[in-house]
Amino acid sequence: VGWDFTFMDGIRDRNTGIWKNISIYATGKVALRHPFIKSELRKPDYGQARETVSVEVINSSTSNSGINCKVKGEIVGENISFEKSFRVIRGEQKLVTFSPEEFPQLVMNSPRLWWPVNKGPQNLYDLKLTVSVDGVICDSVKTRFGIREITSDTKTPDKSRVFYVNGKRLFIRGTNWIPEAMLRHSDERTYAELRYTRQSGVNLLRMWGGGIAESDYFFQLCDELGLLVWQEFWMTGDTRHPHDKALYMSNVESTVKRIRNHPSLAYYVASNESTEMTGTPELLNQLDGTRGYQMQSECAGVHDGSPYKQVNPMQHYENTASPRGSRVDGFNPEYGAPTLPTVEILREMMDEKDLWPINKEVWDYLDGNGFHLMTTMYTDLVNHYGKSSSIDEFAQKGQLLGAINSKSIWEVWNYNKLDYGDRFCSGLLFWYHNCSMRQVASRMWDWSLEPTASLYHTANSLEPLHAQFDYLKNTVSVVNDFYRSFDNYKVTAQVYDINSRKVFEESAVVNLPADGVANDALTIRFPDGIS
């Protein structure tokens, strides 16, 4: 299985060809590769960081017995510099390390920490390294990094996995990311999709195991936007392990070396619903050692996903949306629903004659062979708003359905955040939020980057201070995503009838705990006979 598994046709030759930029450049007698800076933060105040810097020095010459060289480094703008002289023999690839024990200047007091969205600033530093021979610089590298610690454990009431950033618990409100179908990743598209992602309010992106490791620019933007990344390694439960283990492990190594300096990179997972390749955890510990790891997406405190399709929104509140049983609990890696694209996008996808009346064969083809039941279940739910007489009317009502489902999903998880709700919930990864190609089962936006109502209602539900209504209990709760408390705040609920006459109003004073929820702050009493 690949990233195209829910599409109408598989992507031909998807495992061949060049899909990233290739650069050719010249260096002097020696070259630098794969710089890495590792932070160790002092507990419990996180007021000191011990930095360990390493870089590979390569002498690719075959015509000399050895070269005396010097590597110099600096953390730009921090008055921190260091250097080391050594010899590299011909053909040697030497790992040169600068430790805080050897270089006390690499102990940073009061470091500016990096935080995910809503939790603090996205502070970043620059590391610059040069290598010289006889005073002449042969090569230089520069990398950006952030100082932070991300850990996780299963010390929770239900043994579900909970994440921590710089020692503080982090409620995960994340999504699954699927790569563009033909891997046509321009910087402009990447920026647009991550800008939408940040606008939505989510704090983590799962690089689903059937996909890829995204571009350097993708990770750069995640660093700047405060978006965490859960990186999986290209295996799923629907397929066998790679035939060429050495090639697979080489891919893991090159990928980790490429992305490990990014503070947004939070977690490694070997596969989607499968098992790991033997030796993977040992390799990750050798190459990185600063991030958590699990062998597949549904283990170690992360249960299996669902639902994947539209349901009556009340089922999210009742916790009956999944045929597999309770899924609003613990850490769910895949829970979501599609949203119909706008009518303009639908007209770009198919002929008018297939739009209305709905041509089931064509629509199912554009729904991954009917995977999301857009012509049956989704259509039935849209019809709850009344029968439609045109595709324009149907598409508009389809936005209403997508909006209420997205809002219901996020707000149910808000209510049950960590210790505050009826059940302990540590994280949700919405399945999925971006579209890899044109499909009638759209998400927060379509492949052509046209937003749906799902984006705006997700953004509303995930605003850092958010008042929300529980359709099952008729209560109003207030959710706080900041690491600070808010006392003596007033929440007001008003009810209007169909003629815009206010028929109910009530207020309550709430004290919002840091990163907490004031659940059921007030109850709405609907007047009898309201319409």
What are these regions (language model features)?
Residues 11-12, 155-304:
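Active-site mouth of glycoside hydrolases
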Residues 1-208, 213, 415, 419-425, ...:
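Secreted/periplasmic carbohydrate-active enzymes, especially glycoside hydrolases
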Residues 3-6, 13-17, 24, 30, ...:
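Substrate-binding clefts and catalytic carboxylate motifs of secreted carbohydrate-active enzymes
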Residues 123, 164, 188, 246, ...:
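A generic "alpha-helical surface" signal
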Residues 33-35, 139, 253-363:
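Active-site region of glycoside hydrolase catalytic domains
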Residues 149, 297, 432-434:
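A general secondary-structure junction signal
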